[in-house]
């Protein structure tokens, strides 16, 4: 790399993490040159394209995010003399020739500890499984999915009240600074970027969809049910899992929020023991829980609104 010129990077990004990376890179003491941002455009629909809007405000060039699947992008990156390709919360599979195009390498910010939590929606899976700790990993990109060598990893506790959104937020808060650290080290001496091979014998891969096809079973212990509900809770945003569905008083609805009571259940699992303005008290395999909010036909409801005679 020519010492006189700044580090040249391309960012593939979505969501709040992508916005924070763009702003933070430009605020570094020696900011890299952001050659382009690849992100979803408003024309593609879906959630608000916050990275697209941020890139526009910052005056950055925007390229279609879908182009990462084409080898044509590799030539474009080489012609632009790109040093780093940074993937932040974009789910497109990147063509191998694109990964190999940057002079230094391509990197991914993954919201989970590797190799134990590879795949999609892993903050939710961690809560569902009852993990006591979680992590965020910055790693080199290779031809596999979340298999590349680790650059840095931050681990942290999972609180008993963490929702899917809360745990994802922790990943962003601790993970985004790793991207800034990478840019700083790469600009100084790229040979100092760590490259720790993963122990793939410990690898577990998680799919995007929810466990049990999104069905909640009242015959499970209360703790397992509450973890499922919290894992799917991304309010006020849409949940990638939806809300776990259950039969309650003859109605099938998503359980959006629930809480423990610590009271032993003596009734059959699924029995509504009490129904008032605070929610529906429901029996599980071992304890009573309070179902506080349901989801049906695109809106949230109090159980009393749906279940009262």
What label would you give each PLM region?
Residues 259-279:
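A conserved acidic, glycine/proline-rich C-terminal tail/linker
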């Amino acid at each position: 790399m020519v010492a006189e010129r700044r580090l040249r990077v391309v960012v593939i990004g979505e969501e709040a993490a992508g916005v924070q990376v763009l702003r933070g890179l430009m605020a570094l003491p020696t900011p890299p040159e952001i050659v382009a941002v690849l992100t979803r455009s408003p024309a593609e629909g879906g959630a608000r394209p916050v990275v697209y809007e941020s890139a526009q405000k910052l005056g950055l060039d925007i390229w279609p995010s879908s182009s990462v699947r084409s080898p044509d992008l590799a030539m474009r990156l080489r012609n632009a003399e790109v040093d780093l390709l940074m993937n932040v919360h974009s789910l497109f599979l990147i063509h191998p020739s694109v990964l190999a195009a940057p002079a230094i390498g391509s990197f991914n910010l993954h919201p989970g500890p590797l190799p134990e939590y590879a795949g999609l929606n892993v903050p939710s899976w961690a809560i569902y499984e009852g993990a006591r700790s979680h992590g965020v990993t910055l790693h080199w990109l290779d031809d596999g999915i979340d298999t590349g060598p680790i650059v840095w990893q931050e681990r942290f506790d999972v609180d008993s009240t963490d929702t899917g959104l809360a745990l994802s937020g922790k990943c962003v808060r601790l993970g985004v600074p790793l991207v800034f650290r990478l840019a700083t080290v790469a600009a100084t001496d790229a040979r100092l970027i760590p490259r720790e091979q993963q122990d793939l014998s410990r690898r577990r891969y998680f799919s995007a969809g929810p466990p049990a096809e999104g069905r909640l079973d009242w015959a499970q212990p209360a703790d397992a049910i509450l973890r499922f509900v919290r894992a799917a809770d991304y309010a006020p945003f849409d949940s990638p899992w939806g809300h776990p569905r259950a039969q309650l008083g003859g109605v099938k609805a998503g359980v959006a929020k629930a809480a423990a009571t610590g009271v032993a259940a003596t009734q059959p699992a699924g029995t509504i023991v009490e129904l008032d303005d605070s929610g529906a008290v429901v029996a599980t395999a071992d304890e009573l829980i309070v179902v506080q909010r349901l989801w049906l036909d695109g809106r949230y409801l109090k159980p009393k609104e749906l279940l009262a005679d």
